[in-house]
Amino acid sequence: MAGSNCGCGSSCKCGDSCSCEKNYNKECDNCSCGSNCSCGSSCNC
């Protein structure tokens, strides 16, 4: 478990790796603080 608030389309914390829900095997790595990350999208802090 990378983070509690890490879900597909949910807000991810900086440096947290978020696993996409649904039927996607992609992850959201290095999400920006307070930003929303889409499935398979990589955001920089």
Swiss-Prot record:
Q: Does the keyword Transferase apply?
A: no
Q: Which GO terms describe its molecular function?
A: copper ion binding
Q: Which GO terms describe its biological process?
A: response to copper ion
Species of provenance: Arabidopsis thaliana (Mouse-ear cress)
Q: Which domain of life is it from?
A: Eukaryota
- What tissue expression does the UniProt record report for this protein? Widely expressed at low levels.
Keywords from the UniProt entry = Metal-binding, Metal-thiolate cluster
Provide a GO CC annotation, any one: cytosolic ribosome
- According to UniProt, the name of this protein is Metallothionein-like protein 1C
Question: What is the similarity comment for this entry?
Answer: Belongs to the metallothionein superfamily. Type 15 family.
Function summary: Metallothioneins have a high content of cysteine residues that bind various heavy metals. Confers tolerance to cadmium (Cd) and plays a role in Cd and zinc (Zn) homeostasis.
Where is the signal peptide, in residue numbers? none
